[in-house]
Amino acid sequence: PKKGRETSAPPDPLESLRILRDRALVELLYGTGIRVGELVALDVRDIDLRRAEVRVMGKGRKERVVPLYPGIVERLRFYIREARPLLAAKADQRRAGPRALFLNARGKPLTRQGYWVVLRKAAAASGVAGHVTPHTLRHSFATHLLRGGASLRHVQELLGHATIATTQIYTHLTSDQVHKVFESAHPRA
């Protein structure tokens, strides 16, 4: 290279794999509302891309099926087809390949702590201010469903809550929403 010119380093293939994985991770957590512990416990066989659903083992070993929207299906399909095999190849070859859906850079199952790192980086990169946690995404999922008209019972089922009382935490409606519903629904408003 000529003097005074900086050369850019070639792109790191491992970083590209991580980016694909991280996008799938964040999108899956927000798009399904599952707990971070449930997310990192997913195996490849828990994802059914054809039916657009994920089988989740929740608290108390209770299984539930959560639908996936098309954007998540495509992101997961790409991650599973392109990035995951290369990450899995990094694992110890003397053992059977890992079955975990999400793998770290060494080909081992991603941990809860590893997910926190991913989420912090994603929040910083997208300019999100404040403290973002995996539960922030779960809370956003539930709140957006309720504001979109989903029933409390359906949200309870999707979140894997044992009681409706737990789900009611997400029903904090704004004053404007309450007034709007009142004015549109009450015959004398």
Residue ranges and their predicted role:
Residues 1-189:
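Conserved catalytic core of the tyrosine transesterase superfamily
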